[in-house]
Amino acid sequence: MKFILSVLALASFQHVFCDDVERAYAWRNISFVDTREGTYNPEDVIPTGVTHDAKTKKLYFGVPRLYPNIPYTLAEIDTNKYNSSEIRSPPFSKFNSQGGKEFTSIYQPVIDDCRRLWVLDVGEADYKKNGNEYPTKNPEIIAFDLNQEGNPEVHRYKLEGDVAKTPLGFGGFAVDVLNPNGNCATSDETYLYITNFIDNALIVYDMKNRNAWKINDDSFKPEPGKSVFNHKGEEYTYSVGIFGITLGDRDKDGHRLAYYLAGSSTKVYNVNTANLKKKVKSLKPTLLGERGYKTEAIALAYDPKTKVIFFAESDSRQVSCWNIQKDLKPENVGVIYTNAYFVFGTDIMVDADSTLWFMSNAHPPTKIPKLEFDKRQIRLMKVPTHRAIRNLPCEMRKA
């Protein structure tokens, strides 16, 4: 009887809480279009970031050069060509852009309100390399216009000095367009907020004035102790600072609340972007509360339609939600998805159609570079946000 109950419990754990969550794609090993077999090791292809363009139905992936011979570090998939019910593991194609320079290593792509695709090329491969395969250079912020044919490059800025000191510590970033309802084609009233989990810092980039600066705060630091990642009975520890950041709604002056968390913490903070833009010496963030035991996450995403923030958690094999109109405490946090094979949530985003996309890659920031798995370990899921939160604490029900 105990054995039967254990099997039933495991089966329950392997299923989603929300019936509307769909598996978009899953990979054990990722291949590349127009790239000859044997020139790279498919096991070394580990995407860390993803974004979806709702207009073209294309997915864009950051594939950092964690190992040698990665064909390209910014990839795409046209979901119109690959029906997820028929093709579970489509190959990656090289990002299509006119006149763009080659990248060194990209972790995350982000699409802003003007349909510009932003990437941060950290300028350095994350392994000990021989020779000059990928020359080390300064990190660069780059934007491409998805509204134009060929996705031309429309902006590039090289980070220098103190803000570029530890490029392999860059985590997630958010793009803040001040007036997306205006003329986006000429809009340069844009800021980027880039986390650095090694320096426990936030890098602010002012596109109009082409200037970047660093902000430090105690709230950016990891909690005391180590985060633990469990796999096949073994425990792996890590400790990282501020990693995920997302932006709330605009006020009448165009400012927003930036919500952020450290990768080794269950606390969530926010700060008004007006303070970030002013280069203030004292940040004075607000501690919103804690999400609960073992709920560490490195990625979060805000949905303006439902007023909900979603979290891709690190060790719990789940995705959770919290409505910003409620106090942040464990009883107000809901779980929209849990699956034993959703191993280490690496990125999460809400597209222009209010569809939530979240990805796991089984690659935590531990000293063990690659873990062995029996099942496909890279999984990309999707669900409409309003369906994801039904009957959960993060849903605001009408009286």
From Swiss-Prot:
Glycans are attached at N29, N83. Residues 1-18 form the signal peptide. Its main location: secreted. Pfam families: MRJP (PF03022). Keywords: Glycoprotein, Secreted, Signal. Salivary gland (at protein level). SUPFAM superfamilies: 3-carboxy-cis,cis-mucoante lactonizing enzyme (SSF75011). It comes from the Eukaryota. GO terms for cellular component: extracellular region. InterPro entries: 6-blade_b-propeller_TolB-like, Royal_jelly/protein_yellow. It is found in: Secreted. Belongs to the major royal jelly protein family. Probably modulates blood feeding of sand flies on vertebrate species by binding and sequestering different mediators involved in the host response. Functions as a chemoattractant for host neutrophils; likely acts through a G-protein-coupled receptor and effect is dependent on calcium influx and phosphatidylinositol 3-kinases (PI3K) activity. Exacerbates Leishmania infection in mice when co-injected with parasites and yellow-related salivary protein M35. This is Yellow-related salivary protein M10. It comes from Phlebotomus duboscqi (Sandfly). The gene is K04.
